[in-house]
Amino acid sequence: MTDTPGLLGTPLAWTPPARPAGPQMERAGNGSQGPGPLFLTSPLARGVSGVFVWAALVLTGHQIYLHLRSYTVPHEQRYIIRLLFIVPVYAFDSWLSLLLLGGHQHYIYFDSVRDCYEAFVIYSFLSLCFQYLGGESAIMAEIRGKPVRTSCFHGTCCLRGMTYSIGFLRFCKQATLQFCIVKPIMALVTIVLQAFGKYHDGDFNVRSGYLYITLVYNASVSLALYALFLFYSATRELLQPFEPVLKFLTIKAVIFLSFWQGLLLAILERCGVIPEVQVIDGSTVGAGTVAAGYQNFIICIEMLFASIALRYAFTCQVYSEKTESSPAPSAPMQSISSGLKETMSPQDIVQDAIHNFSPAYQKYTQQATQEAPRPGQGSVPSPRTPTHSPDGGPGGGRKGRNVEKRMLIPAEEL
């Protein structure tokens, strides 16, 4: 490189022409985009999450089919199938939310369905434990009058000097049922507020509905899980033959992981770890939407491991053995479909809510539910229930009617 004399005799140094500053300035000015596109919208994230989701769906779908094919103890397997459905609901819902991540916040509608089913799962697990033990009266025959074991770990440190009564079982049922009522209401309120622009994920402003819905939801789910834990600690020895530890830990892990993940992501958002603004497909989204996207991605991955754990926790072996020992043929597809329809019916939840919140509850308590064997499923009684009342009706293809027994409870025991 040589110097060329200037107009006044001073040397001028040659410099290469500068690159256009437009793209660099645009890239630097748009710091919200970062060094590259958002990972959640990349084909890698969507492909990996899709593989995990479909693997979980296949594993859980096969297990649900096995239970429906060996539907020999309906009053137990009804709740087991409901619990197993948590994987398809969580996995597919989270994957759709991830695929539709953007400025329109379509994921809120899918997440509302997922959260409502969470309440359904908590109630179903408690009801399954009740069925294992023979119903409320059978449980009271074992624990009535026994002192409550006080423990900070079990959350009973403030119950010193108290004994178990029918009121304890009623509290456990009411605490789980209230979540089944509160959660759908909060989901509906969320959808309405989002439609009017008054709800944004991660917005803790007092003028936003997110703060109040989060407070109500956390209080409701905490009460439901606390009641579930209280019931388990009170009946742990009675439930021992049914191997409840893996069942209990698996269900609580699925629910608690989603809860604490959401809380952790909200904290990271408040700390500024998640950028305030992101651009997805030309639409500007806030940090709350991005945090919800990361949670949905994590849930997609976790559901495969949850499906494996549930496969061991709620095995179909004991029910399939009943089918093999029965001389009746295997259940046809019509019986499988009717069993699935019965499983998804919320009628028992409505009846249970009316029963437990009724002022007349103090006059009676629910006895174990007895059901008739289904056609084509044999009449082998469950070892967990003393008897089965056959359906005396002529409808051979109709499901057996529920026969509920009631037992009077003295008012002073409430």
Curated annotation (Swiss-Prot):
Q: Please give an example of a GO cellular component term from this record.
A: cytoplasmic vesicle membrane
Q: Which Pfam families match?
A: Solute_trans_a
The record describes its membrane topology as:
Multi-pass membrane protein
Polar residues bias: where?
379-388
User: Where is this chain's protein located in or outside the cell?
Assistant: Cell membrane; Cytoplasm, Perinuclear region; Cytoplasmic vesicle membrane; Early endosome membrane
Q: Does the keyword Lipoprotein apply?
A: no
Q: Which GO terms describe its molecular function?
A: heparin binding; transmembrane transporter activity
Q: Membrane-crossing residues?
A: 48-68, 83-103, 120-140, 177-197, 211-231, 248-268, 290-310
Out of the domains of life, which is the source?
Answer: Eukaryota
Main subcellular location: membrane
Keywords attached to this entry: Cell membrane, Cytoplasm, Cytoplasmic vesicle, Endosome, Membrane, Transmembrane, Transmembrane helix
Briefly state the protein's biological role.
Answer: Acts as a heparin receptor in vascular cells. May be involved in vesicle transport in exocrine cells and Sertoli cells.
According to its UniProt record, which protein family does this protein belong to?
A: Belongs to the TMEM184 family.
What the entry lists under PANTHER family is as follows: ORGANIC SOLUTE TRANSPORTER-RELATED
What protein does this entry describe? Transmembrane protein 184A
The gene behind this protein is: TMEM184A
